[in-house]
A protein has these predicted regions:
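N-terminal mitochondrial targeting presequence
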Residues: 1-30
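Generic N-terminal amphipathic, Lys/Arg-enriched alpha-helix
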Residues: 19-28, 48-60
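Glycine-rich anion/phosphate-binding loop at the beta-strand->alpha-helix junction
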Residues: 128-157
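Glycine-rich nucleotide/cofactor/substrate-binding loop typically near the N-terminus or early
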Residues: 41, 54, 59-61, 66-125
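Generic structural signal for well-ordered, non-membrane alpha-helical segments
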Residues: 32-36, 62-70, 80, 130-137
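N-terminal basic/disordered segments at the start of proteins
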Residues: 29-43
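Short beta-strand segments
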Residues: 51-52, 88-90, 145, 152-154
Length: 157
């Protein structure tokens, strides 16, 4: 008697299959992209996401006002039922969604004096040179689109 073959997918395989194909393809090609677990879960569950740029954190305001502003915007996004996906580059790796310590690292110019302002033209060089940087709206939009995030909010100083 033949038994049906059943295959159980691991939870990571189920998650991967639910992510946007552009993000899966970029990861498969070795693009250095890290998606925060909360953002990845929101993508899988089709929860509302808002992409946030980080240039205002790295270049727009002095510390600690820059950090307080970024955290305030993230809290506001959460208060309306969405998940914030603050986007930046750290050590040449694209971060879609930042940990609190990563956001502070980009904001604190005394401990990290070298973050660059990253527009779309600067992305490849920042990755190749393993730089840290705050993404402008144009660079943030590229990564948001890659991840399937349809809403972008820019911070204003």
């Amino acid at each position: 008697m033949l038994r049906p073959i059943t295959r159980t997918l691991s939870s990571s395989a189920r998650i991967t299959r639910s992510l946007p194909s552009s993000l899966i393809s970029a990861r498969a090609r070795g693009v250095p992209i890290d998606v925060h677990p909360e953002v990845e879960q929101a993508l899988v569950e089709h929860l509302p996401l808002v992409a946030l740029e980080t240039t205002i954190v790295t270049h727009g305001m002095p510390y600690p006002v820059n950090l307080e502003t970024a955290r305030s915007v993230e809290r506001h996004v959460r208060s309306v039922g969405a998940v914030p996906a603050t986007i930046g580059i750290i050590g040449g790796r694209v971060k879609i969604g930042l940990e609190s310590a990563q956001l502070e690292y980009l904001a604190e110019s005394r401990t990290n004096p070298g973050p660059v302002k990253l527009s779309r033209r600067d992305i490849a060089a920042a990755i190749a040179l393993k730089k840290d940087g705050g993404t402008t709206c144009s660079a943030t939009l590229i990564f948001a689109a890659l991840a399937g995030i349809k809403v972008l909010a820019g911070l204003m100083s």
